[in-house]
Amino acid sequence: MFMGEYSHTLDVKGRLIIPAKFRNQLGEKFIVTRWMEHALRAMPMPVWEKLEQQLNQLPLGKKEARQFKRFVMAGAMEAEIDKQGRIIIPSNLKTYAGLAKNVIVTGSGDSFEIWSDENWQSYTAETAENFDDIAEGLVDFDF
């Protein structure tokens, strides 16, 4: 399971160190794609394959379904970790996520997310402010 919050830096070549605890769970190759709130989502191949199946079952007669599928699939890339524990983030994904030097890597259960420090700080501040309301809105979640 991917969990925790880690602060790292993106080097000038667009390489990002993946936390050691995450590397052990990823396998040889994994997928990184655009995700919600201008973050990137990275996941092991089995998780990607499940998501891919779900995307392929979306009703393509609905514009939103086509948009979501295209956006996620077109933004997806296969990644490998180098000997120094880094991955290369291509420029299109860096631009989408607003990644500069300071990057936050966050665990998200079956996957992890890559955020710009600025976007993450803004997101967590807003979420913290509304956390009780968010929790109460999860009607199917048994605390």
Swiss-Prot record:
User: What SUPFAM superfamilies does the database record attribute to this sequence?
Assistant: AbrB/MazE/MraZ-like
* Keyword terms of this UniProt record: Cytoplasm, DNA-binding, Repeat, Transcription, Transcription regulation
Cellular localisation: Cytoplasm, Nucleoid
Q: Entry's CDD domains?
A: MraZ_C, MraZ_N
The main location is cytoplasm
Q: Which GO terms describe its cellular component?
A: cytoplasm; nucleoid
Mention one GO molecular function.
DNA-binding transcription factor activity
> Matching InterPro entries, A to Z?
MraZ, MraZ_C, MraZ_dom, MraZ_N, MraZ_sf, SpoVT-AbrB_dom, SpoVT-AbrB_sf
Domain SpoVT-AbrB: where?
5-47, 76-119
- Name a biological process GO annotation: negative regulation of DNA-templated transcription initiation
Q: How does it assemble?
A: Forms oligomers.
Family, according to the entry, reads as follows: Belongs to the MraZ family.
Please state what the protein is called: Transcriptional regulator MraZ
What is the scientific name of the source organism? Leuconostoc citreum (strain KM20)
